[in-house]
Amino acid sequence: MLGWVVTFLVVALIAGILGFGGIAGASIEIAKIIFFIAVVLFLVSAVIGLARGRTRV
């Protein structure tokens, strides 16, 4: 699951760079939404991993 979170985070960062750079002005809101979803998924994965006793995050 952490692999998916990292993948979505990278996609969100790329979309954010393109959107905020003026290349694709309409994608700014989509990039923000995807970025925050990726952050939430990362935090959920980290909490679940810590709750299960895994030391890797």
From Swiss-Prot:
Major site of localization recorded for this protein: membrane
One CC-aspect GO term: plasma membrane
Membrane topology: Multi-pass membrane protein
Domain of life: Bacteria
Compartments where located: Cell membrane
Keywords: Cell membrane, Membrane, Transmembrane, Transmembrane helix
Segments passing through the bilayer: 4-24, 30-50
Family statement drawn from the similarity comment of this UniProt entry: Belongs to the UPF0391 family.
Protein name (database record): UPF0391 membrane protein RPE_2138
